[in-house]
From Swiss-Prot:
One of its GO terms (molecular function) is metal ion binding. It is an enzyme of class 3 (hydrolase). A divalent metal cation 2 binds at D75, N106, H197. Pfam families: Metallophos. InterPro entries: Calcineurin-like_PHP_ApaH (IPR004843), Metallo-depent_PP-like (IPR029052), Metallophosphoesterase_sf (IPR051158). Belongs to the metallophosphoesterase superfamily. This is Uncharacterized metallophosphoesterase aq_1054. The lineage of its organism: Bacteria, Pseudomonadati, Aquificota, Aquificia, Aquificales. Its cofactor is a divalent metal cation. It comes from Aquifex aeolicus (strain VF5). The keyword Signal does not apply. Keywords: Hydrolase, Metal-binding. One of its GO terms (biological process) is lipid A biosynthetic process. Its EC number is 3.1.-.-.
Length: 261
């Protein structure tokens, strides 16, 4: 009984132990000496339970790391956002020089698409729904909706292949997709996939056993093909009870370094 109570208490505390997971990727697609820093604040699950403490976690990392781009790979919203516009305003204060981009996760559909889109836009994010945008001379960011929206009867834009096959692959192509899956035939069009959703399984053994069979990985970085990667965040918040065990929350920082001519 004592051990169960101790584990329960620790698993709640762990939800506050935010880690910053840093990765550096080199590419010939950016000129030598060019660096672009991207921050992924995935799975904040903002709503009646996860509130300003989660946004403050994100803001502290943002202010320290000073990313060029801020992305949110789904499940930013998780609940009735009535009277919570101040959370959107807190996020709107973050203004990276190359922009803010988000995609929809499953929870944005569960709690209502319109209020979710409204919140994300008030927070200053451009929501990518089956589209790709050129950021500068070297970078493309694409995003697709989460597939759960279709099951719930929404019109969704989920086909990454349809989006990616039209991008300029001479540029460095990043795909934002909530669940860490990608069609095999789409990999040749993309350089980096940023995802969330898994929470590292919430309990580490769930991630290492079950989720790695379902998704590309439950956390961290995996090479999909030579020079092509997926990076999965364990997320900032939690979608159920605020509990984690050996799967602490994280924010991902990816630095893309050029080594081209």
């Amino acid at each position: 009984m004592f051990i169960a109570v101790l584990l329960g208490a620790y698993s709640h505390l762990e939800t506050y132990f935010l880690r910053v997971e840093k990765y550096t990727i080199e590419t010939e697609k950016l000129p030598k000496g060019t660096e672009i820093k991207i921050m992924n604040a995935s799975d904040m699950h903002l709503g009646p339970v996860m509130r300003e403490d989660r946004v403050e976690m994100v803001k502290r990392v943002y202010e320290r790391e000073k990313p060029d781009i801020l992305v949110a790979t789904g499940d930013t919203v998780d609940g009735n956002m009535k009277n919570l516009d101040y959370l959107a305003q807190m996020l709107a204060e973050l203004n990276p020089p190359l922009g803010k981009f988000a995609v929809l996760g499953n929870h944005e559909y569960y709690v209502g698409l319109n209020q979710s889109l409204d919140f994300l836009r008030k927070a200053g994010f451009r929501v990518l729904r089956g589209e790709a945008v050129e950021i500068n001379n070297f970078l493309v960011i694409a995003g697709v909706d989460d597939s759960d929206g279709k099951r719930l009867g929404y019109r969704v834009f989920t086909d990454e292949l349809e989006v990616l096959k039209n991008v300029d692959t001479k540029k460095y192509v990043i795909l934002l997709k909530h669940k860490p899956r990608i069609k095999r035939e789409a990999i040749k069009y993309v350089d980096l996939v940023l995802s969330g959703h898994t929470h590292g399984g919430v309990l580490f053994f769930v991630g290492y056993t079950i989720l790695r069979l379902i998704f590309e990985t439950d956390r961290g970085i995996k090479e999909l093909a030579p020079g092509k990667y997926i990076i999965v965040s364990k997320g900032v918040g939690t979608g159920g009870p605020p509990m984690r065990l050996l799967s602490p929350p994280d924010v991902v920082i990816v630095t893309i370094k050029g080594k081209g001519n």
